[in-house]
Structure formats: structure tokens, C-alpha cells
């Protein structure tokens, strides 16, 4: 068997991305000393680039060969053929204008698109006894390298336990499968989750802090896989019951009263203070210098979340007493 002739102009092809996986099939009644093989150059090619299907170990004394799109060898799937005698190239209905067949049976596909993914069949015809040719078939499958996916969300800011969120893995990729990850692990399905039939869409019912993410999606096929960047839902919640610091309730007359209020909330809560039911100020802190018994009373802090519309409050009873040694008179008659 003579050496394989190199296809012309292959040195000008720039390679990247799209994976081709070859499934070798035995040739029917085709006696050869070596198995005909096909090599994808490059092994990976991205959409818009070129790929060469380089054929090795061609038998001698060939009449010609035909390339088909798919595994059905009919006129509709006929791409192109090469007739050895006369070096004639014939194009069929499946020819897109981007395919070039060479004298060594190799096929160049330029500007690869997603429609190019799938099976291809090479039909080799060997000279027989002058009346019949001996044929053989070689089929391989071309897989598009999966693009890096991204996650879109129907609502990135859901209210806790109240709203449903729909996450979608993009783009929609033919002949690909979808996987989901949460917190870096395979998705732990719960009664609050549901996947679409294709697994491309994830439904989250009544999102809680345990199901807020981060989420990742992965697109994979038999040739490659790619995972998205993580997406974490900004869960709107609260406010929880506020806490007043310090929780001291007794003060000496003349001390400063310096109170702070905090409630767990997203977004951060808005605070207001009342003393004995009367509004005092807005803000997280309440400061009164040199308090006296007239400042005795019920100090209440209210926290409100404008995003959830929820409000919560807590209170503290403050009692101001005379400093040690001044006695009851000083307490009842402050100066």
C-alpha cells in the first residue's frame, strides 16, 4: 500500500474547538492489509472554524469514493464524490459549498456550524473484475464542542419561602445533556425542586436560605463538557426579631444611654425608636446623654424591610436610679 497523499492547502487551516469522535466499522468484502481509519484534524474545533477528516490506509486500485451526511446512503444525503479516473469531483444535494474532497478521500469542512454535527459516512468503491465494484463503508460521528453555558433566572431576588424561581441553562444545545450543581455538589433534589424533561430548566419553589445556591449548570455530550459560572440568588428575607444592645435595664442617673438595634434582614432593615409609644428617631442607634429618672420607660426598636414589606419590633424597659449614697430623696427629687 502506497503512502497516503497529503491534501492540498491544509497548512492554511487554523484549528480550535469541536470534538470529533470516530466509530470504526468493518468494511464489507474489502480485503486490506490495514484497517481504513479516519483522523480529525484538529481533535477539537469550535463553531466557525475548519475541520479536516483525514483518511488513512486507503486500499489501492480504487474507482472512487462518496461522502454522505448521516448514515443513510441516498441521493438526499449525498455530499460529494471523487472519481479517480479523470479526477472528477461531483457535488450532491447535501453539499453546502463548504466541503472539499481530496484525492486521498479526506474531506475538509470549512466554517463549521452546529448543523454539521452528526454522523458522516464514507463509501469507498474498489475496482473488481470489471463488472462489479467492491464497496466498503466508514462511519464517524462529529460532536460539537459544548459552549460555556450561562444561567438565566426568572428572578434573582426572590422573597424567602414566597416565590418560585426558574433557572435556565443556556444555550439550548442539540444532542447535549444538562446537569445541575448546587454548592459545588451534584444537585440534591428536594420537594422544593423540579427539573424539566430535558433537565435544562430548574424550578425552585419557595426558595429558602438552604436552596439559594450557588448554582452551576453543565452541558455535555459524548465529546466534551463545559460548566457555567456560579449563580447565587439574592434571597430577600426578614427582618427577624430585633435585638437591643446592651440589654442592661438599670442605669444610674447621670449615665449616658447608648442603645443599638440589630435585626437579621436582607436588604438591611430600616430602624426606628419609640419611648413609651412616642416616636423618637429613625436609625439603628439611640443615644441620650446624662439620663435621669424622667427617662424611665419602655424603649422599643422597630425594624422594617422595604423589599419584603415585613416589620418586627422588640422592647426594653429602662429604669434610672440614683447613684449609690444619695438615698431615696435624691431619686425622688432629681436635680
UniProtKB/Swiss-Prot annotation:
Annotated GO biological process: female pregnancy; heterophilic cell-cell adhesion via plasma membrane cell adhesion molecules
Disulfide pairings: 169-217, 261-301
Gene: PSG11
Native source species: Homo sapiens (Human)
Name of the protein in its database record: Pregnancy-specific beta-1-glycoprotein 11
Protein's UniProt keywords contain tRNA processing: no
TM annotation in the entry: none
GO cellular component terms attached to this protein's record: cell surface; extracellular region
Keyword line: Disulfide bond, Glycoprotein, Immunoglobulin domain, Repeat, Secreted, Signal
